[in-house]
Amino acid sequence: MGSDTLAAPPHGAPRVDRDVVSRFATCCRALGLTVNDRQRPADLTAARAGFAGLTHLAHDQCDAWIGLAAAGEVTPAVVDAVWRTVASAGVLQREIGLAAGELGFTYDTGWYLQFRATEPDDFQLAYAARLYEAGEFGEADGLVGEILARRPGWFDARWLQVAINHRAQRWSDVVRLLTPVVTLPSLDDVTSHAVRTALGISLARLGMFAPAMSYLEDPAGPIEVAAVDGALAKALTLRAQGEDDEATEVLQDLFATHPENTQVEQALLDTSFGLVTTTSARIEARSDPWDPETEPSEAEFVDPGAKDRKAHLLLEAEAELAEFIGLEEVKFQVARLKSSVAMAIRRQERGLAVAQRTNHLVFAGPPGTGKTTIARVVAKIYCGLGLLKKETVREVHRADLIGQHIGETEAKTNAIIDSALDGVLFLDEAYALVSTGAKNDFGLVAIDTLLARMENDRDRLVVIVAGYRKDLDAFLDTNEGLRSRFTRSIDFPSYTAPELVEIAVRMAEKRDSVFEKAAHDDMERLFTHLAQATTPDANGVERRSLDIAGNARFVRNLVERSEEEREYRLDHSDQEDFTDEEMMTITAGDVQRSAAPLLRGLGLSVPA
C-alpha cells in the first residue's frame, strides 16, 4: 500500500463536525474495531444501520461510505459513493485514531478472487469492477490502466484488468497479462489456483489446446467455482483433441459432484457441445473492442497478414519437399497436384469453367516411406493456395474412430472429423476399418459417417487415406462412394539401399554424428539384405523385410541405437578424455550391435 494515500489534510483544513466524529466512532466499534482503546463484539446489523444514517448526515465523507461497505453494504451505489468522495478518505479515521488499513471492505473482482479495499487505489479498483460489471468496459479499463502505469507490479490491478478482458472475451489479452505471473512463487494457493485456471481456459478458447492442458490437467484447488470451470474446460479441451473417452470420464466425475450444473449435463448428453474458439487477430478485428458480438466470424474474417503467410507456407512446402531423399516420382506428383489446384483457383477467379475435381488423396506404399510427412506438405500447399484455412494434419487410425457400442462409432468419427475441419484428416492403414470382414463391423459405420461428412463439409475437409496399395484397393471397394471421392493417387515406393544410407548419414549429421566408412558399407549390406528378403506380416502376407522394418523409420531407430552403442563404448573404455571426432564417430561395430536387437524385435532374420 502507498504510505501517503491517507495523508493528513494540509494545515488549516476545516475541522470536522464533532457529532459526525462521535457517530463514526460508535459505528466503528459496532464493526468490532478498537476505538480509543475500547472494543466490543461486532454487531454488523447495528453497524449497517449506524453507517447508513451517518451517510445521510455526512454524505461527503468517504469514511462513512467505507464503513457502510465494511458492514456488508457493498452495493453499486455504495461503491460509487466511496469513489465519488475518495478525496476525503481517511479524514474521520484519523480523527478517532484508527490505524491505516483497519477500516475497509471486501469486493468481488468478478472472476474467482475478492480483494480488500482500504485506500484510494483500492477504491479505484473496486469502482472499476463495478463499472465493467455494468458494461462500462472502456472506462473501467482506463481506471485500472492508470493505476498500472504508476504501480506496474501490483497484482490486484493486473487481476482487475484480467477480469475485465475475461468478461469481454478478450482471451489473448488475458493470456498476455497472466503468463508473466503464473509461476511467481509469491502467489498464495488461492491466487495461484485462480491464475492457473484463468490462463488454461483462455488458452483453450484460443484453440491452443496443448498449452491449455498444462494448466488444466489438475483443475482441483481451493476455489470451488474455479475447480468446476477448470474441469469443464479440461473435458472440452480433451474433446477438441479427439480424446473422447477421457473427456467423458472427466464430465461424469464432474456431474457426480455437481449435478445442478447445466453446462456439465449438456456436455455429457451432447457430444457436439464444445469450446467456441477464436484467434487474437479476430479479437483485434472487432468494431467494438469490448463487444464479442462485433467480432468477425471465421468465415467473415479477412486477415491482413494472410497473403504473406500463405506465400511462406508454399515456400516451406517446397523446401520440405526438396529435402526428401529419393521419392522423385512422389515429388513430381505433388508438384502436379499443386499446379492443378493453383490453376483451378485462378480459372475460378476469372469466371472460367472449372472441372469438378476431388482434392482427397490416396497415398499407397509401405510404412516409413514418407506418407505422413508428405501429407503435411500437401496440407501446407492446400492452405498456401487458399483451398484450406489451416495447414493442420489430424492423423488417425481405426481405434480413434471405432466404438464398442451402437451409436458410439458415429459419435467418435464425427468428433474426429470436427477436429480436422479446415485442415487435412490423415487416415493411416485405412483398410483396418474393414479388415475383420464381419458384416456388423462398426468400421462400415465409420466409413458411412466419413462419406457423409466428406459431402456435407466438402469445402472444409480434405481426407488422405494411406496404406499398402492392395489393401487400399480392397478398402475402396467396400463402399461404392469411396472410389468416386478418392480419384487421385500417389504411389510411394520403398527406398533403395543407397537412399537409406544417405538418409542415415543426413540424420546423423543433424545430430552431430558421423559414420565411419566401414559403417557405411555395413549399412548398405544390411539394407540390401532387407530389400531382397521377404517375411510374412501379421496377416500372413509376404512383404519385403525392409517394408516390415519400416524403411526410413528403421533407419531412424538404427541411428539412435548406434549412438547409444557409441556412448556405451566410449564410457566403458580406458580413455579419460576424447576428441570431438571420437565422440561423433559411429563405428561399424556400433551399427552391428544395434542392428541385431532391432531386427529380432521386429521378427526379422539377422544377416550373417
Curated annotation (Swiss-Prot):
The keyword Nucleotide-binding is assigned to this record: yes
Taxonomy, superkingdom: Bacteria
GO terms for cellular component: cytoplasm
A Pfam match: AAA
Binding annotation for ATP: 365-372
SUPFAM superfamilies: P-loop containing nucleoside triphosphate hydrolases, TPR-like
InterPro entries assigned: AAA+_ATPase (IPR003593), AAA_lid_6 (IPR041627), ATPase_AAA_core (IPR003959), CbxX/CfxQ (IPR000641), CbxX/CfxQ_RuBisCO_ESX (IPR050773), P-loop_NTPase (IPR027417), T7SS_EccA (IPR023835), T7SS_EccA1-like_N (IPR049078)
Gene: eccA3
Protein name: ESX-3 secretion system protein EccA3
Biased segments, Acidic residues type: 290-301
Region span, Disordered: 284-303
Species this protein is from: Mycolicibacterium smegmatis (strain ATCC 700084 / mc(2)155) (Mycobacterium smegmatis)
Main function: Part of the ESX-3 specialized secretion system, which is required for siderophore-mediated iron acquisition and for the secretion of EsxH and EsxG. EccA3 exhibits ATPase activity and may provide energy for the export of ESX-3 substrates.
